[in-house]
Design a protein with these regions (language model features):
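Catalytic Zn2+-binding segment of zinc metalloproteases
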Residues: 97, 103-123
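Low-complexity, serine/threonine/proline-enriched polar segments
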Residues: 126-165
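C-terminal or late-domain output modules
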Residues: 3-28, 64, 73, 204-227
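Intrinsic-disorder-associated interaction segments
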Residues: 8, 31-38, 42, 145, ...
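Short flexible/disordered coil segments
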Residues: 120-131, 191
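Auxiliary, metal-adjacent structural segments of Zn-dependent hydrolase domains
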Residues: 13-97, 118, 128, 135-146
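Pan-zinc metallopeptidase signature
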Residues: 156-227
Length: 227
């Protein structure tokens, strides 16, 4: 994979002007499948994300990789080993912005581990919602033990995606989670919250998840541009 990216990067740099998001290079290994105004997208990301919050990202790649598939579910972006990989299969500029913000959120988890997870309050908020959801589900096919696990679990993910379905969960969990995908794991609860703090209905997020909201507020407002 790395040799493929390096070879493609040389060819890409010959054809395209080097792009950046806050001085982090953004490399087009594969062109977007749809007519995406990526320069406008990158400019918007720079406006809404303080530069100090991309310190853990070394490079952005637009490229196809195997990791965009997990358990027969497709993803459009991935943060791994200091790089954010972006699928060229983006429906719109809005989808691309969502994906970038979401993966930047994941890039912050190690640096801000104590602030996000250290006191356990965010996990308690998340699992409290999971337990409430369990009692709302009509004849759940998994036990409470599964709902009380904050980590990603393939069996639980399939239960959410296949047994219950996101449409059902969207209706059932509207008063608990900002979106059904936030139910997946504590890490996704964090990333969905960060994404929608910046792009969604901030007041709704605060009402639904006050602990999550306050963690995000603190990290963003204590970043160097806001200090």
């Amino acid at each position: 994979m790395l040799s493929y990216i390096k070879k493609s990067l040389v060819e890409s740099n010959k054809a395209h002007k080097q792009l950046h998001i806050h001085n982090v290079p953004a490399n087009m290994i594969v062109p977007f499948a749809n007519d995406i105004d990526y320069t406008a997208v990158f400019a918007k990301i720079q406006k809404i994300i303080p530069s100090s919050l991309v310190n853990n990202v070394d490079v952005f790649y637009v490229v196809n990789i195997e990791n965009f598939q997990r358990d027969n579910v497709s993803f459009n972006a991935l943060y791994k080993d200091g790089a954010i990989y972006i699928s060229p299969e983006q429906d719109s500029e809005t989808d691309l912005i969502d994906d970038l913000i979401h993966e930047i959120a994941h890039s912050l988890e190690k640096e801000y581990q104590d602030e996000i997870y250290g006191d356990g309050n965010l996990e308690r908020e998340f699992l409290g919602k999971r337990k409430t959801l369990y009692h709302l589900v009509d004849k759940p096919t998994l036990s409470m033990v599964n709902y009380n696990n904050a980590e990603y679990n393939k069996q639980f993910d399939l239960h959410m995606y296949e047994d219950l379905g996101y449409d059902y969960l969207r209706m059932l969990a509207a008063g608990l989670f900002y979106s059904p995908y936030a139910i997946t794991s504590l890490r996704e609860y964090w990333a969905i919250g960060f994404e929608n703090y910046l792009l969604g209905d901030r007041s709704r997020l605060k009402d639904l998840s006050p602990v999550l909201y306050n963690v995000i507020y603190s990290i963003i407002n204590n970043s160097e541009e806001y200090s």
